[in-house]
Amino acid sequence: MKYPLLILTLIFCCGRDPLGTAEATHQNSSQSSASKASTQSIPAVDLQNARKAHDLLEQAIQALGGQAYLNVHDFDEQGRTYSFHHGQPTSNGMLFWRFVEYPDKERIEVTPERDVAELYVGNKGWELTYKGPHLIEAKDLNEYLRHRRFSLETVLHDWVNDASVALFYDGNALAGNLPADEITLINSKDEAVDLFLDIDSHVPIKKSYKWRDPVDRQLNIEEEIYDNFRMVQGVNTPYGFTRYFNGDMQTERFVNAVHYNEQLDEAMFDPNSGYNPNKPQKKH
């Protein structure tokens, strides 16, 4: 049984200045004279562009709640999700309960009885039913891991703090029909992510990236839209989420409630624990 993957980005942080290796080298007085000369050859306009991108990312963090946002360790949410194939709905939607503990634990429960779940811990995934845990098919697991690898929390927690990641401010753009500031991040593997920040509030309203299918070698584009932001426990939270695959709507999710830092029961992330969501949870 296959259920839609529900990836929502609700945490990222920013530490040291992530303007790329070039600027970091320029500011490091212990560098060799050759490295300094190389850095000084970079046009000032490029460094200014990277600084602009960095400053906008800082504004995005503040717009999402600042320190309250950075301090999120876990969260749970519930709502209704819809899946699509070639842009056409495949069902009337279903209820979901989602639990995330950073950096790599996630549980998604579906059906009104919450007796079917998908569980991801590290690089492994299981489907949980009354028959017990079963490993998720490799294709579906790889899809989930790709979404996590390019998720906002990964990009804006890990990439932004990686001195080898280059930042580019691409100027004004449209995210759907909304004006936005566009930023591109490129990591050391030459993987790129485009972020679109609301031009007024600075919250991220769109993310896109490309990847090549290892089987047919076709280039694919995935986009995520975030909307209907509400402040919850000091965290500016998107209650609306939509994913597009090569221009076609793939998943749409509407959140009804969110809670942060609830100290989730660790048993829910153990596929063999027999965890029952309908019994009172044990905090840890």
Q: What is each residue range found by the language model?
A:
Residues 72, 103, 162-164, 178, ...:
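Extracytoplasmic
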Residues 90, 134-136, 205, 237:
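Generic structural signal for well-ordered beta-strand positions
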